[in-house]
Amino acid sequence: MPATLHRTRSTNTSPTRLVSSAVVVLLGALLASSGVQTWLSSRSLATNFVSPTAWRQLVRLPVGAMPNVDQGEVSFGSIVLVLGAVSIVTWLAGAYWIARRRGSSYSESLATWGLVGWGWWCLIDVWEWTWIGAGLLGATSLSGLLAVSPQLWLAGCLAGWLTTLLTLARSGSSRAVLAKDSSLDESQAARTPRWLWLACGVYIVVFTTLNWRLYFNLLMPHGDSVMYEEHLWNVLHGKGFRSYLDQGLFFGEHIQFVHLFLLPLYACWPSHLLLELCESTALALGAFPVYWMTRRCLSRDSRFPLQADTLALAAAVAYLLYAPMQFLDIEIDLKTFRPEAFGIPLLLLTLDQLERRHLVGTLIGLAITLTVKEDYAILFGPLGVWIAWSGSSEPVTATTSARSSFLAGLLPRDLNRFLAGMALSVFSVAYLWLATRVVMPWFRSGAEVHYTRYFAKFGESPEQIVGTMLSNPGLLFGELCSTATVLYALLLLAPLAFIPLLSPARLAVGLPLFGILCLNELAKDPRHQFHAPLVAVIFWALAGGLPRAVELVRKLLARWTAASTANDEHDSTSRTICTHLIWTASLCTGLFLTISPLGCPFWDVGSNWHWQKLYGPSRRGELFARILPLIPRDSRVASTDFVHPRFTHHERSYDYSGYRRKVAGDRTGVPDDTDFLVIDTNHRYSEIKSAAEVPEYRDHPADWELLPDETDGYFIVLKRRR
């Protein structure tokens, strides 16, 4: 950044600087308008920002236009007027705020804010020229990548713009505090966690409310969500660790039982609402180990022990704003409870204990994390390698005690460190083999684990999959070296301004799992649950990369600014930039990625995730209350997926869908012992709209009684005649 970033007072701002600033603001508005027009003129580009319905309204397509029309016209003049007005208002208001905060003249603040801030607006249109150039040069991969990621480019420019404003507005009193010694360290450290508690509390309230509204509105599926609550109910009532989606115990699906630790709470409040509250709380509390690890890494630099608190708090807030983490709370398909989510705070706590070098805490953390899912063992292999080769490269902190030190007695020498790390790696491989090749097949009566079909291109069993990868490396590298892989990485790293890349050894711990996820044919983006283990590794790498990011920014400032600028000014400014860049990058990428209230889809009327469609009053939810009393709790009920959650406390709750189920004799339809059949006709995935379309009632009318409709056709209730 230019030297003007550091000037605190100037009474002789030259007219040339003011004119130059105005020109940059005007140029930024024009170039940004050009880029926005390009994005909005194409349906395929615009839907990275808005819903197809909103795009059709923006370009004013006629009602009868074909739904697959990809081009539309957006007035460049209209965009210039809007962005020009935004530019003028934010330029003038921002300069006023900067002047008040810094104690500088308004003209100086106006010139500096315009020159530096609107450089980011000019960068918006660089995307367009790069995209055009890639097309002309035949770089189809680059062109394709740019076409699916303009939202990340815009988010980066917005984050840079906000970071510039907040850095320029750093008050004189703040700079004075930064220049002091660390005598205020303890009082500041005591205050900072209060803000962290507040941020976590806001997250818990918001996401618990959203999850509960989905439940009340019958928009939460049973499969891969409420089925986990059924596990707890069945265990509590002596039916075994199972869901009646299929016969057999759940260990045939995954070695996953972390949610059983909720049984004491569940016994007091047996409701799925409790599970949603616990999951949101657990995810939010993951911000604390992020804070602790980041602060520890930064505090090792004696130049800024105090500022480590602020940077660590920014990292923790970025974690709460991080879209891939939020998708573990509410997935893109509205699956809201996944035990995998508990692995994020558990693994973060384990890594925190590892950094503190607490042997007992680390071992307990590793053991509990393995209860989340067998996938976490994939991380422990490379983590063992990291311990073996890099684990002792970081100095012991002052809080490390000789009695509890991870390295004391266990890793005092290179050989012992190497053996401990390799032992963890060998254990992880053995555990993964035992889980997938022995335990799970045994609970499946010898059948192959179900997720081998996610890698159907490579084979039908783990042995075939590995064999194909070794014998056909071209197929493997073709799948890995793709636009989808790069986009996946961008979606994980861009929200953190790519700072985790500055800690490559830590980030490499997640590389094998990331490669596996890129081969997954079911989902190749961080909007489901598969990426959960990577979230913890990425924030661990963020903690390790932040000190290097601060140093990198400091060197850039020293190179770009006047030699007379004091080094301590470079230090404080670089820390301020990194502090704001972390959370603004997470916030701005979330505008286009997350479906929370901070995301555009939440407010886009044409979006499937608009707040009124998902969380507002629901006619389906109101009418369902009329039929629930008709079905006794001791009955066996088959139901469609989105009403199934309301029957998990009945004697049996069966899935009614097009899938073949073992409980139904490996055929579609209901099991023979079913007493009631409940069908939801008005969910957007519903295929049956009337009783005449129900195969059981249509083919065997003498066996079923159609109960009177009291729901205006929203639900069909059939009772088996006995």
Stretch-by-stretch model annotation:
Residues 256-263, 272-276, 283-289, 312-349, ...:
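Aromatic- and kink-enriched transmembrane "portal" helix at the membrane-lumen/periplasm boundary
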Residues 289, 339-365, 390, 537:
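Specific aromatic-rich, kink-prone transmembrane helix
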Residues 31-44, 210, 220, 416-502, ...:
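Membrane-lumen/periplasm interface segments of specific transmembrane helices
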Residues 111-119, 194-201, 310-313, 425-429, ...:
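Signature aromatic-anchored transmembrane alpha helix within multi-pass, membrane-resident enzymes
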Residues 140-157, 287, 378, 507-557, ...:
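Hydrophobic/aromatic-rich transmembrane helices and adjacent perimembrane loops
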Residues 108, 116, 285-326, 344-345, ...:
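Transmembrane-helix signature of polytopic, membrane-embedded enzymes
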Residues 88-99, 273, 277-302:
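Transmembrane-helix motifs of polytopic, lipid-linked glycan transferases
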Residues 1-31, 79-119, 135, 141-207, ...:
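Start-transfer (signal-anchor) and selected internal transmembrane alpha helices
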